[in-house]
Amino acid sequence: MTERERYIEALLFGRPDRIPFTPGGPRKSTLEAWRQQGLPEGAYWMEHLRRQIGLPPEPAIERIRPAADFRMIPHFEEKVIERRASTLVVQDWKGNICEISDKFDTRYLRDAIDFVTRSWLKCPVETRADWEAMKPRYDLDAPGRFEPDFVARGRRIGERQHVVGYSFPGPFWQLREWCGFEGLCMLFLDDPAFVREMIGFWQGFVQRMLERIFRVFTPDVIHFAEDMAYKEKAMISPAMAREFLLPCWRAWCAQIKAAGVPVIDMDSDGYIGELIPLWIEAGMNVCDPIEVAAGCDLNAFRRQFGRRMGYTGGIDKRALARGGQEMRAELRRIEPVVQGGGYIPGCDHGVPPDISWPNFVEYSRLLARMTGWL
């Protein structure tokens, strides 16, 4: 099977020859720790890992992904506003003003380079005037929205072997980026009409973006980024999510399904058990990363939702950090879901630096056996 066929078959309860091997990805601090623990300096971690556990190199295939940018254009200026004793007050590319450790800079807020905690001081949409100033940044015809040869590249990949998909924020995530979490929560109560207006704007922008993509080719997966849960609970009630968010999710899913995209993947950290029924109703068929520390339990989800929902992730990062018998027990815990299909197992978020390189190698070897690679 090709990589693409295997991915789709695995998530849609088909008959893959093997399950995709996706142990999880490290960030900068993790790689720095690993280089002190046995990962050679200069070695690409995945290539070295595969060699160390006895997997062949990843196939050398041409990987084309026609670029389409769902983000604001232009970005806000990234700048340092104030230097404090051990922190920086900065403006990020989205227009947020926040405080971060002086060990980092604005690049860490632009890309997921590392695990960065920040304090939010001001968000770009706090008034109606701010909102009117924000909207022009989502011009569909802005330079750079689609790469110049988007159509030509899209038409080249009809018989591709690799997975091609697009990711963009869901309505909750996007409005939180504009208004801030507390600001958005207050707007749900104080000015619901404004919330609906912003959701409608974002829904329409995404639909027009997808329409242009689907004219050229059909991706394999569309991924919604929608972090909207804490430990044990969602950030807003399921009733409020149904009222404000479900219409947008449903409209997107209808458009995506009509285009023939096989996988619609919802990404939310935290405990998502009370949200999954809404996602199924909207038309999504996969979700991730299934964070165990938040209370997510793949076995319980599978019993409750059956084959209506597939998953990626779901392996407790804390057990991987502890290693040994606890790590092996964690892999045994998820094995029934692996065997039942509709699941690509992996670490339940970015791989943190407390997972040592030796533990990660052992975990990856066990995972490769479980998924049919060894």
PLM regions and their residue ranges:
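Segments that shape or occlude catalytic/ligand-binding pockets
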Residues: 30-78
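Active-site loop segments of alpha/beta catalytic cores
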Residues: 1-39, 89-91, 100, 117, ...
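Extended Gly/Ser/Thr-rich low-complexity repeat segments
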Residues: 98-115
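A structural signal for short, hydrophobic beta-strand segments that form beta-sheets
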Residues: 78-82, 105
